[in-house]
Amino acid sequence: MANFKGHALPGSFFLIIGLCWSVKYPLKYFSHTRKNSPLHYYQRLEIVEAAIRTLFSVTGILAEQFVPDGPHLHLYHENHWIKLMNWQHSTMYLFFAVSGIVDMLTYLVSHVPLGVDRLVMAVAVFMEGFLFYYHVHNRPPLDQHIHSLLLYALFGGCVSISLEVIFRDHIVLELFRTSLIILQGTWFWQIGFVLFPPFGTPEWDQKDDANLMFITMCFCWHYLAALSIVAVNYSLVYCLLTRMKRHGRGEIIGIQKLNSDDTYQTALLSGSDEE
C-alpha cells in the first residue's frame, strides 16, 4: 500500500518482533548459563513466536490484497499488470510466512535439520532487500534515498542470520539481528511520516539535498536508538534474573536455617529426656 498505513503496518510488525527478541534472547542466554534451566519452555516459546510471525505475515498479505483499491489476487487483466506494488509487498510477506512455518517445523518435527530455520529466514530478509532494490526506480530522489538506506539493514541482517546457521545460539549475532529488526521497524514508520505525512503536516521537498543529508543522519539516530533498546533490555533482564536468583538463595538459606534450628531443638529435647 503506497500510503502511511502501508508503511506503519510492516513497521509495527518488525518493531514488535524486535522488542520481543530483545527480551527473549537475553533470557535464553542467561538461562543457558544456569544449571537445571527449563529449556523446554524456550522451545515452546519459539513455536509460539514463529506462529505469531506467520500470523503477522498472513495479515500483511491479506491487507495488501484486499484493501478497497487492492488487486484482490488479480495480477494481470486486459493487457495490464494490476497493482504491482501491492504484489511486491505481498511477496515480501509471503517469504516471512514461509520462514515462520519452517521455524515451527524445526521444533515440531525431529528430522528437520537444525539451521534450516535460520537459512530460510536469511533468504526471506534477502528477498525483502532484493524487492526493495527494484522498488523505487523512477521515483523522486528523497523517495529513492530513504528506501535505499533500508537496504543496509536488510543485507546486513541477511549476512548475520546466515552466520547463525553455523554459529547457532550465538548471543552477539542474535542481538545484532535484533537491533537490525528494530531499526527496520522504526525506519518503516519514518518512511511513512516522510513520504505520506499524516495529520495534515507539510510535505517534504523530495528534491532538496538538505533533506537527503538529514535523512541519512536520521537513519544513524534510529540505529543508535535500536542499539540502546537492546542494551537496556539486556541489562534489565540480567538485573531481574540476578535479583530473583539472590531472592531464591535467601529463601533456601532461610529454610536450611529453620531445619537446622529444628534439628538442634530436637537434639536438646532428646538429651534432656535421657537425663
UniProtKB/Swiss-Prot annotation:
<dbReference type="InterPro" id="IPR042127">
    <property type="entry name" value="TMEM45"/>
</dbReference>
<feature type="transmembrane region" description="Helical">
    <location>
        <begin position="47"/>
        <end position="67"/>
    </location>
</feature>
<comment type="function">
    <text>Plays a role in innate immunity. Mechanistically, promotes alphaviruses RNA degradation by interacting with the viral polymerase nsP4 and the mRNA-capping enzyme nsP1 and thereby interfering with the interaction between viral RNA and nsP1.</text>
</comment>
<feature type="transmembrane region" description="Helical">
    <location>
        <begin position="146"/>
        <end position="166"/>
    </location>
</feature>
<comment type="similarity">
    <text>Belongs to the TMEM45 family.</text>
</comment>
<dbReference type="InterPro" id="IPR006904">
    <property type="entry name" value="DUF716"/>
</dbReference>
<feature type="transmembrane region" description="Helical">
    <location>
        <begin position="180"/>
        <end position="200"/>
    </location>
</feature>
<keyword id="KW-0399">Innate immunity</keyword>
<keyword id="KW-0812">Transmembrane</keyword>
<dbReference type="GO" id="GO:0005765">
    <property type="term" value="C:lysosomal membrane"/>
</dbReference>
<feature type="transmembrane region" description="Helical">
    <location>
        <begin position="116"/>
        <end position="136"/>
    </location>
</feature>
<keyword id="KW-0472">Membrane</keyword>
<feature type="modified residue" description="Phosphoserine">
    <location>
        <position position="272"/>
    </location>
</feature>
<keyword id="KW-0391">Immunity</keyword>
<feature type="modified residue" description="Phosphoserine">
    <location>
        <position position="270"/>
    </location>
</feature>
<feature type="transmembrane region" description="Helical">
    <location>
        <begin position="7"/>
        <end position="27"/>
    </location>
</feature>
<dbReference type="GO" id="GO:0010008">
    <property type="term" value="C:endosome membrane"/>
</dbReference>
<keyword id="KW-0333">Golgi apparatus</keyword>
<comment type="subunit">
    <text>(Microbial infection) Interacts with sindbis virus nsP1 and nsP4; these interactions lead to viral RNA replication inhibition.</text>
</comment>
<keyword id="KW-1133">Transmembrane helix</keyword>
<feature type="transmembrane region" description="Helical">
    <location>
        <begin position="94"/>
        <end position="114"/>
    </location>
</feature>
<keyword id="KW-0967">Endosome</keyword>
<dbReference type="GO" id="GO:0005794">
    <property type="term" value="C:Golgi apparatus"/>
</dbReference>
<dbReference type="Pfam" id="PF04819">
    <property type="entry name" value="DUF716"/>
</dbReference>
<keyword id="KW-0597">Phosphoprotein</keyword>
<keyword id="KW-0458">Lysosome</keyword>
<feature type="transmembrane region" description="Helical">
    <location>
        <begin position="212"/>
        <end position="232"/>
    </location>
</feature>
<comment type="subunit">
    <text>(Microbial infection) Interacts with chikungunya virus nsP1 and nsP4; these interactions lead to viral RNA replication inhibition.</text>
</comment>
<dbReference type="GO" id="GO:0045087">
    <property type="term" value="P:innate immune response"/>
</dbReference>
<protein>
    <recommendedName>
        <fullName>Transmembrane protein 45B</fullName>
    </recommendedName>
</protein>
